[in-house]
């Protein structure tokens, strides 16, 4: 699982083959997931494991599950709606027909990379179309994102816009904003389409204005309990990784420094005693104080796997970008 991805990230940073061997030992336990067409997170799961494994090692054994899973994921796309369906379930009291969540942007890296690897333009087209449709429908005028947009599968019409895991439908759920920043930064990096860079910069500008002084967002920017509410370390880690990338991609010199400075601030705070657990504590996770879904009372103020993953990813990117190692000084 993602625990093995951590080992691969540590290998990438240190060059210690022990960690590479530990990661490879268990990666193929995820092999059956390649056919799991009922889960929109398939791209996220396979890119973080098999995708990273191939990127780092170049070994051919990782290619088949990458291609198969990408094509299975593309099967969740509808040309009528122009997006990949997220959830197959309907919650009590909700009348969703074709729900799409902002988190789904994180699956596009797997699709686009597979399209490049295998010369499969259909996969790239699905990724681009999903990103374009989401850009049109998920965002408010202030560049904050809804969590969920529900479409009519018959004609593609937007039926409703909600924020299921946030404070209210019109609130800015922190991790949703992180997925949005990361997703459009990533799509520009892969495709070179300027509209994605513009969107990423607009989202980044909104975040720079609204983030607390230490860089760690409250679980929802519009919670009515600020400043006494919970922070979300996972959102900060995702943002930090995206901010590092965006600092290298932007054409605006004045913004480059602002993005990198925010990433460094977030990483320093996450690496402080307030968020970084001591060895052997916190269930052996790195980061404390993430929030899964406050409205569902699920994963409240706990460690989360993807918080650790993006924290390590952000540290690696920061190290490459600045040729330094972050510390607490």
Name the predicted role of every residue range:
Residues 10, 44-59, 85-103, 143-172, ...:
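Carbohydrate-binding/catalytic loop surfaces
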Residues 10-24, 54-67, 115-128, 188-201, ...:
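Structural helix-adjacent loops and short alpha-helical linkers that scaffold large soluble proteins
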Residues 18-37, 66-85, 126-144, 152-163, ...:
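Long, well-ordered core segments of solenoidal/helical folds
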Residues 1-6:
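Short, small-residue-biased leader/transition segments that mark boundaries at the very start
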Residues 61-64, 228-241, 246-247, 253-329:
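CBM-like carbohydrate-recognition segments
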Residues 176-212:
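Oxyanion-binding "anion nests"
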């Amino acid at each position: 699982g993602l625990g093995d991805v951590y080992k691969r990230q540590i290998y990438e940073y240190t060059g210690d083959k022990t960690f590479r061997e530990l990661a490879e030992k268990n990666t193929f336990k995820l092999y059956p997931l390649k056919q799991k067409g009922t889960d929109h997170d398939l791209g996220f799961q396979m890119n973080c494991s098999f995708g990273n494994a191939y990127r780092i090692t170049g070994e051919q054994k990782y290619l088949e599950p990458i291609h198969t899973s990408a094509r299975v994921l593309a099967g969740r796309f509808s040309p009528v709606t122009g997006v990949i369906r997220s959830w197959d379930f309907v919650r009590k009291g909700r009348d969703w027909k074709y729900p799409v969540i902002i988190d789904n942007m994180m699956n596009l890296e797997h699709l686009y990379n597979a399209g490049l690897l295998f010369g499969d333009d259909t996969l790239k087209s699905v990724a681009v179309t999903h990103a374009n449709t989401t850009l049109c429908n998920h965002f408010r005028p202030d560049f904050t994102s809804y969590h969920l947009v529900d479409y009519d599968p018959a004609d593609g019409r937007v039926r409703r816009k909600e924020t299921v895991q946030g404070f209210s439908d019109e609130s800015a759920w922190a991790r949703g904003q992180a997925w949005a920043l990361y997703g459009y930064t990533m799509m520009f990096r892969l495709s070179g389409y300027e509209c994605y860079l513009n969107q990423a910069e607009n989202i980044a500008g909104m975040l720079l204005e609204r983030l607390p002084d230490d860089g760690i967002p409250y679980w929802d920017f519009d919670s009515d309990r600020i400043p006494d509410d919970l922070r979300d370390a996972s959102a900060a880690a995702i943002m930090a990784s995206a901010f590092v990338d965006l600092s290298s991609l932007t054409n605006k010199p004045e913004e480059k420094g602002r993005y990198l400075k925010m990433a460094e601030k977030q990483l320093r705070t996450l690496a402080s005693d307030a968020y970084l657990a001591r060895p052997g504590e916190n269930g052996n996770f790195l980061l404390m104080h993430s929030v899964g879904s406050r409205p569902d009372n699920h994963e409240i103020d706990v460690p989360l796997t993807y918080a650790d993953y993006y924290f390590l990813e952000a540290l690696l990117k920061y190290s490459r970008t600045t040729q330094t190692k972050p510390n607490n000084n």
